[in-house]
Amino acid sequence: MARQRLLIGTIIVAATSLLNLIPLEFGILGSPWPVGLLWAICGWSGLGPNLTTATLLFFLGLWVDILTAATLGTWAFIALSTHAATLVTAQYLGTNGLGRIGSIAVSGTIMLLIMTVFQVWRGSNFFFVGTILTIVSAIGLYHYVGFIFELSEDEL
C-alpha cells in the first residue's frame, strides 16, 4: 500500500512540476509548483529515514531542475537537505501534535532557510518575498492534497 501511495505521490509532484511551464499563478501568492516537492518531503517524512523516499526525492529534484532550467542538482540538493532536516525536526518535535498544516509549515520554513542559504552561497539573484509567498501557497494546497502523501512507518 505504501509503495502505491509513493508512486501516486511521485506522479502528482512530477505532473504538477510540469505546470512550471505554464505561467499560472494564484494572485499575490504566486505559483506553488516549484515547491510542490514540499508536499512529498513533508508527507514522506513519516516513513522515517528511508532510501526509497530519498531516491524518489532526488530524482524529483532533478526533474524540477530540468523543468525550471536551474543548475542541475539544485532542487535535488534542496529536496534532500529539507527532507533530512524535516526528519531531524520531526524526531525532536514529534509530528503528532503539529497536525497536517503545522508539520508542513515547519518543513516549509526549513525549505525556505535552505533555499536562502543556497542562493546566497551561489551569489545569484533571489526574490525572497516571492519565495515566501510560493511556499505559503504550497502550504495552503497541502491541506487538500496532504492525505495522499502522508505515510507512516506502520505502512511499510
Residue map of PLM features:
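Terminal, non-globular segments
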Residues: 1-156
